[in-house]
From Swiss-Prot:
Keyword Transit peptide listed: no
Its job: Superoxide dismutase-like protein with no enzymatic activity.
Entry keyword Transport: no
GO cellular-component term (any): virion component
Source taxonomy: Viruses, Varidnaviria, Bamfordvirae, Nucleocytoviricota, Pokkesviricetes
Family under the similarity heading: Belongs to the Cu-Zn superoxide dismutase family.
Record keywords, A-Z: Disulfide bond, Host cytoplasm, Virion
Disulfide bonds: C52-C102
Entry protein name: Cu-Zn superoxide dismutase-like protein OPG175
GO molecular function: metal ion binding
Gene Ontology biological process terms, A to Z: superoxide metabolic process
């Protein structure tokens, strides 16, 4: 299992890469974006020393996520990515080829308990 923590200004989230019933899934949630469609992309380097400028070229398109009117995206995507090959690389959230937020993909402890996703209600709480 792998995890990427996104913490870039108002944009925050947790994205997990994990096998579920024999298929690899991308699960998580992101808050702080405007309503619309965004892309999840794996990049060559896990170097975020200069923000998303230093993560290198895009390598793998994971899929699109939709942010609702409350600024929340719930992520549940299938992927063919071999999880062991993406450890140490970066994941970006992009729109129109602009990298809005990114984080490094790391190894995560496998926990059989329920994953609590970030949630927000209509009052912004």
């Amino acid at each position: 299992m792998a995890v990427c923590i996104i913490d870039h200004g108002n944009i925050r989230g947790v994205i997990y890469f994990e096998p579920v019933h024999g298929k690899d899934k991308v699960l998580g949630s992101v808050i702080g974006l405007k309503s619309g469609t965004y892309s999840l992309i794996i990049h060559r380097y896990g170097d975020i020393s200069r923000g998303c400028e230093s993560i290198g070229s895009p390598e793998i398109f994971i899929g699109n996520i939709f942010v609702n009117r409350y600024g929340v995206a719930y992520v549940y995507l299938d992927t063919d990515v071999n999880i062991s090959t993406i450890i140490g690389k970066a994941l970006s959230i992009s729109k129109n080829d602009q990298r809005l937020a990114c984080g490094v993909i790391g190894i995560s402890f496998i926990n059989e308990k329920i994953i609590h996703f970030l949630t927000i209600n209509e009052n912004g709480v």
